[in-house]
């Protein structure tokens, strides 16, 4: 048991440090190659993008020490994210690529006796849907990465309580890698994650949920994403991420909702305008709440 906790501590700490150091390096390189502008600031701030590359490399390097097959959804979703960041895939193209990659991953997991035939399709659908959900709840400094860390830690604790050691350790390394990115992505953001950073979150968590049959806790943990996507769909139909216009920043430094499509952040701002870091904190608290509920459901079950 002592040896297990030493490995646990070692892998997670090194993954965190590696991700943070690599992210710092990439920020300097990407600022002149791939960058965007922070839309919720009074000044026009130039911010490097694709910081998720640091997390992709960190997870690809350290998760195989636990179980190599668990890195597959991260790498495939990450590659699709890179293509999307550079070439701007349409929503339909992104869904198709994620579904096809999900089928391939499902077959590989089936060949290694992790899932049955029906679960191959569940993995494909899970990767397609979940990756898009974690990609859509975004647009504010630290939001998507912070929510991803909360969701992955929540699922890690569910797996720990159910004695799934390999899944728990994989999810913990995954969380540590994203924490390394969050240091630079939190308000005020010094780097944006890009789709290479957001798509793998949903893909990895969906695969863990299917492999370890943690369907209900996973669905509960993902509820903030589901609510956000439902609000967007009901208010505006299917949109590409580029169509997600920023909220209004007024002279008092607060963000306001003044019409247009609804989302979870906009629903909050509709009733109480607030500053960007405060809004993100509220959303993190919502994520933590559903994470705790998911953990409690696992304990009861």
Curated annotation (Swiss-Prot):
GO terms for cellular component: plasma membrane. It is a multi-pass membrane protein. Keywords: Cell membrane, Glycosyltransferase, Membrane, Transferase, Transmembrane, Transmembrane helix. Its EC number is 2.-.-.-. The chain crosses the membrane at residues 2-22, 62-82, 95-115, 117-137, 140-160, 164-184, 191-211, 280-300. InterPro entries: Glycosyl_transferase_4. Its main location: membrane. One of its GO terms (molecular function) is glycosyltransferase activity. It is an enzyme of class 2 (transferase). It is found in: Cell membrane. Belongs to the glycosyltransferase 4 family. Pfam families: Glycos_transf_4. The lineage of its organism: Archaea, Methanobacteriati, Methanobacteriota, Methanomada group, Methanococci. This is Putative glycosyltransferase MJ1113. PANTHER family: PHOSPHO-N-ACETYLMURAMOYL-PENTAPEPTIDE-TRANSFERASE (PTHR22926), UNDECAPRENYL-PHOSPHATE ALPHA-N-ACETYLGLUCOSAMINYL 1-PHOSPHATE TRANSFERASE (PTHR22926:SF3). One of its GO terms (biological process) is cell wall organization.
């Amino acid at each position: 048991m002592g040896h297990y906790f030493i490995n646990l501590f070692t892998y997670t700490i090194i993954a965190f440090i590696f991700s943070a150091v690599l992210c710092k390096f990439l920020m300097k390189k990407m600022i002149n190659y791939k960058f965007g502008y922070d839309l919720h600031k009074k000044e026009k701030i130039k911010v490097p993008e694709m910081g998720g590359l640091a997390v992709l490399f960190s997870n690809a390097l350290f998760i195989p020490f636990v179980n190599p097959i668990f890195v597959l959804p991260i790498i495939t979703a990450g590659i699709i994210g890179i293509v999307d960041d550079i070439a701007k895939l349409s929503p339909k193209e992104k869904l198709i690529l994620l579904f096809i990659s999900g089928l391939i991953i499902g077959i590989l997991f089936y060949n290694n006796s992790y899932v049955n035939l029906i679960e191959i399709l569940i993995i494909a659908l899970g990767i397609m849907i979940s990756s898009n959900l974690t990609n859509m709840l975004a647009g504010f400094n630290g939001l998507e990465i912070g929510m991803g860390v909360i969701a992955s830690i929540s699922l890690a604790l569910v797996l720990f309580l159910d004695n799934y050691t390999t899944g728990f350790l994989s999810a913990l390394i995954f969380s540590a890698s994203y924490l390394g990115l969050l240091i630079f992505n939190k308000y005020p953001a010094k780097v944006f994650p890009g789709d290479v950073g957001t798509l793998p979150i949903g893909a990895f968590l969906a695969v863990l949920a299917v492999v370890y049959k943690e369907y209900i806790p996973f669905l509960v943990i993902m509820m903030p994403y589901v609510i956000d996507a439902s609000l967007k769909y009901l208010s505006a139909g299917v949109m590409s991420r580029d169509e997600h216009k920023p909220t209004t920043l007024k002279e008092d430094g607060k963000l306001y909702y003044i019409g247009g499509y609804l989302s979870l952040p906009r629903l909050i701002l509709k009733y109480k305008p607030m500053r960007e870091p405060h809004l993100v904190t509220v959303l993190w608290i919502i994520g933590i709440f559903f994470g705790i509920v998911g953990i409690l459901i696992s304990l009861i079950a």
